[in-house]
């Protein structure tokens, strides 16, 4: 196979990996945790993965502590947890 063909194959495999959704067996366990605003009093929009609805939802994050199932963007939540 030529080097151009190898580069094309590598590019297609990389694109497939990026676009393939996370399967439930590959999903991090913290994606099962409930939304946790934490003890602080900030009012930040954040997102968490809801395993019952199998989607990412908005919630108000206080700005500290909480748990790892807290994302700044819905895209980050989907990329990490959504199947």
Curated annotation (Swiss-Prot):
It holds the Pfam family Kunitz_BPTI. GO terms for molecular function: serine-type endopeptidase inhibitor activity; toxin activity. Expressed by the venom gland. Residues 31-81 form the BPTI/Kunitz inhibitor domain. SMART domains: KU. Gene3D superfamilies: Pancreatic trypsin inhibitor Kunitz domain. CDD domains: Kunitz_textilinin-like (cd22594). GO terms for cellular component: extracellular space. It is found in: Secreted. Disulfide bonds join 31-81, 40-64, 56-77. Residues 1-24 form the signal peptide. Keywords: Disulfide bond, Secreted, Signal, Toxin. InterPro entries: Kunitz_BPTI (IPR002223), Kunitz_BPTI_sf (IPR036880), Prtase_inh_Kunz-CS (IPR020901), TFPI/VKTCI-like (IPR050098). Negative results: does not show inhibition against serine proteases, and voltage-gated potassium channels (Kv). Serine protease inhibitor homolog that only shows inhibitory activity against MMP2. Belongs to the venom Kunitz-type family. This is Kunitz-type serine protease inhibitor homolog mulgin-1.
